Regions:
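Secretory targeting signals
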Residues: 30-86, 111-190, 225-243
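Hydrophobic core of alpha-helical transmembrane segments in multi-pass integral membrane proteins
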Residues: 26-35, 206, 242-254
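Extracellular/periplasmic helix-loop-helix junctions in multi-pass membrane proteins
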Residues: 198, 211-238
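Central hydrophobic cores of alpha-helical transmembrane segments
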Residues: 25-29, 193-209
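Helix-loop-helix units of permease transmembrane domains in multi-pass membrane transporters
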Residues: 86-120
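Hydrophobic/aromatic residues in alpha-helical transmembrane segments
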Residues: 83, 95, 184, 250-254
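Aromatic- and glycine-rich beta-strand/loop motifs that create alpha-glucan
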Residues: 1-27
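Junction motif at the cytosolic side of a transmembrane helix
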Residues: 11, 245-264
Length: 264
């Protein structure tokens, strides 16, 4: 167990070292989002941490009858690109051969990679939340005017009593959904090549924009798609369950692929 823990730590060190510039760009994206919301939208008015964070994970509410976007979800797509890139980089970096030898078995090697991918995803969402918390002067509040005029939803204002639902919609669902997509990406990266996995991952994220469907994991990354913000929105519990099923199935496939694939 100690050897496996060291393997995880070494993987994390290698991942953070290789992706330091990507993390920097990610932080810049979050900061620019907060600055734009504060000065470009609210013109200096009070904005709470909840508003900042929702602006980051909201995605798009729905597509009109002609399948036209009312807005381009830049931050959602930014998350998609950063997470997909880091996932691919973790699977294919210069430390791999050392880690394979250190792991001793292929199963431990792939499990260590999956663990590091999950930790990176959690790290990115938590970093975004912390930046928003500090930007909102540590006040976790929501501005009703902002939701009605800018975010385009007033349903939330009338249906926001379930505090546990906040945790599911704002944190659990996006993290699990992103991880489910990364697991699909890993399957294609192992079976074909790294670029194929990245392309598949981005396709899933993009298709999810145009279809409100619990079977498309990208919907879990967009808070506005949930029943908390849409009258006929998706059930967050169903979204999480489907994503967990995807994770389990892809894990089984990965273990099967890795058992016969030459990874050296």
């Amino acid at each position: 167990m100690k050897k496996y823990n060291k393997l995880i730590i070494n993987n994390l060190k290698c991942s953070f070292r290789n992706n330091i510039f990507i993390y920097f760009l990610f932080v810049v994206l979050i900061l620019l989002s907060c600055i734009y919301l504060k000065n470009g939208v609210m013109h200096g008015k009070s904005v709470g941490a909840g508003d900042y964070y929702f602006n980051i994970i909201k995605g798009v509410e729905k597509i009109d009858s002609n399948n036209k976007l009312k807005e381009i979800p830049f931050i959602y797509l930014g998350f998609a690109i950063f997470i997909s890139y880091i996932t691919g980089q973790i699977l294919e970096n210069e430390c791999n051969k050392i880690f394979i030898i250190y792991a001793g078995t292929r199963k431990k090697w792939i499990l260590s990679k999956i663990t590091v991918i999950f930790i990176n995803i959690v790290f990115m969402y938590m970093t975004a939340a912390i930046i928003c918390f500090m930007s909102g002067k540590r006040k976790i509040t929501f501005n009703s005017e902002l939701f009605e005029k800018y975010f385009g939803t007033d349903y939330f204002i009338q249906n926001n009593e379930n505090k546990f639902l906040y945790i599911l919609v704002f944190f659990a669902a996006p993290i699990i959904a992103s991880f489910a997509i990364s697991m699909v990406q890993t399957v294609f990266s192992l079976a074909v090549k790294n670029m194929a996995g990245f392309i598949i991952s981005m396709i899933i994220y993009i298709i999810s924009i145009f279809d409100i469907n619990i079977f498309l994991p990208g919907n879990g990354c967009m808070a506005q798609r949930s029943s908390l913000f849409m009258e006929n929105g998706l059930s967050v519990s169903q979204v999480i369950i489907i994503d967990i099923i995807i994770i389990v199935i892809t894990l089984i496939i990965q273990l099967k692929i890795i058992s016969v694939k030459d990874i050296l």
